[in-house]
Amino acid sequence: MKKPTNYPTTMKQLKTATDIVSLCVIGLLTGQASALSLTLIDGSVGAVAAGNTLTAAVQAPASGINVDGSSIIYQGTAIQGQTQAATYTGFSLAPSSGSTPTLNLGDGIFLTSGSANIPPTNTTNSFSNALLQPGSGSNLLLTTLSGFNTNDANALSFDFTVDPGVTSVSANFIFGTDEFPTQSVTDIFGFFVDGVNYAKFSGGELISNTPNNPTNFISNPVGSGLYSIEYNGLTKAFNVVGILDSGLTTHTLTIGVADTSDSIWDSGVFIGGLKAGTATGGGGIGTTPDGGTTLILLGGALAGIAGLRRRLA
């Protein structure tokens, strides 16, 4: 399908638009390795360049989604030196011990409520990058979803069309947070298709650390070295499916995370593989096998880049 001419479709165009600068650093921990590579997006590149880069990176090859380039909206910090979002490759986190799963995810984007420049090990229970005020502000969809004021929102939104017969869109994600397991004021993730959020656990809980869903997270305690990543809590790799509004010819997708009520203790979502599909019913999330391919759909009844590319290990 032909994309609008103002939408960057080649790496040459993307590099020209965003001035990508990469520095690869590889590290290994004894008995454990990670190939997660982040290309950080500096706030100074501007919302247009950041939005174009993230929109291209979140989609699967031959996604079947025709993005209206003029509709792309990126919400994130605009301050030089602040890196709230990133693109990523090679997400594969193997546990150092025990029976917890290896977490694998296809390439995509990383949105956070603070900093995407996360440490390669879990060193603190309160990793936080309080964005220089006024930060990135609130997000109406996430505020309405959570029922609380939101701050430090990091969101990507765009309009798109699909071929006849397409009824859904889907993506694969892992949500991580340093709010787990102790905080009652928590961050939130939303995946909104035509205004409806489909990012819910199978029991209907929102994707956030709340007292009602501790079993939905894998614990990664400080000092345990279980996973080579900062966050205290991680979800499994999930596939989220959103059902398109059949009454619309142009659809809207919004992906976002935010702090609720405060501006501290970071969370983030790794998400990619966005593509069109033919699912019907209520949508929702389900687990994915290695590599981020859909295994089973659960919850059917649930209604410039001034980048540092590095490897976390």
Predicted features along the sequence, with ranges:
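Aromatic (Trp/Tyr/Phe) and Gly/Pro-enriched flexible surface segments
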Residues: L36-G286
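Bacterial N-terminal signal peptides
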Residues: D19-L29
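Alpha-helical transmembrane segments
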Residues: L14-V21, T288-L295
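N-terminal secretory signal peptides that target proteins for export/translocation
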Residues: M1-L14
